[in-house]
Amino acid sequence: MLPRHSCSLLLFLFLLPSVPMEPHPPSSTLPPFLAPEWDLLSPRVALSRGAPAGPPLLFLLEAGAYGEPAGAPANRSRRGVSETAPASRRGELAVCDAVSGWVTDRRTAVDLRGREVEVLGEVPAAGGSPLRQYFFETRCKAESAGEGGPGVGGGGCRGVDRRHWLSECKAKQSYVRALTADSQGRVGWRWIRIDTACVCTLLSRTGRA
C-alpha cells in the first residue's frame, strides 16, 4: 500500500501532457584541427572548390591595379608587378622583376620550426564537398632564353652601380596558415613559408654593406 503523497505524485506524472522531444541536429562544428582560425588566414591563401579566377583584392590594391577600366584583362594571375602598374607609371622599372600566380599543386612546405610538412590537397568542409588549398605566390621572374640582363631571379638588380655593389634578385618568403600533416601523420593548421616577393640584396664590394 503506497502512501497518499506517492499516489498523488504518480497521478500528477500520468496527467502531464506528453511533450514531443525534438532530436538535436548534429553539430556542424568541424573537429578542432579542421576549423581554421579565419582571422589568421592570409589573403594569399584561398579555400575553395575551384581555382580562383584572379589575384586577391588586396594584391590588386597594393599593385595599384584597382579601378582599371572594365575592358582591362580580368585574369592577371600570371602577370608580373610591372604589367599590373597603372598607365601613369608605365615608365618606371622595378629593381627586380616578379611574377605572381596561384599555386595549385603545392605538396610540401617548411613550417615555423624549420621542418618539412605535407600540405594537404583537400580541406574537409561541413555539409559539402571538400575544399582545396590555393596559394598566391610571388617569385622572381626566371631568365628567359636569350633574354639575359639585370632584374631576373639569380641575376643582378636593375639600376645598381656595379662598381661598388654586388647585387642579386632573390625570393622573399612569408608565413601563412595551411592545413598540413607532419612526419608522424598529425594533421593541423600550421604556419608554412611561401614566396611572397622578389627583393634586391646588396653586398658592398669593399666588404662593408
Curated annotation (Swiss-Prot):
Q: Which InterPro entries match?
A: Cystine-knot_cytokine, Nerve_growth_factor-like, Nerve_growth_factor-rel, Nerve_growth_factor_CS, Neurotrophin-4
Disulfide pattern? C96-C169, C140-C198, C157-C200
Top-level taxon of origin: Eukaryota
Q: Name one GO molecular function term.
A: neurotrophin p75 receptor binding
Recorded hits in Pfam families, A to Z, give:
NGF
Endpoints of the signal sequence: 1-21
Does the keyword field hold Cell division? Answer: no
Q: An example Gene Ontology cellular component term from the record?
A: endoplasmic reticulum lumen
Q: Which residues are glycosylated?
A: N75
Q: Which SMART domains does this entry report, sorted A to Z?
A: NGF
| Keyword field | Cleavage on pair of basic residues, Disulfide bond, Glycoprotein, Growth factor, Secreted, Signal
Compartment(s): Secreted
Q: Supply one GO BP term.
A: ameloblast differentiation
Keyword Transport attributed:
no
**Cleaved propeptide residues:** 22-79
Query: Which family does this protein fall into?
Result: Belongs to the NGF-beta family.
**The protein's name in its UniProt record:** Neurotrophin-4
Species, as recorded: Mus musculus
Q: Which gene encodes it?
A: Ntf4
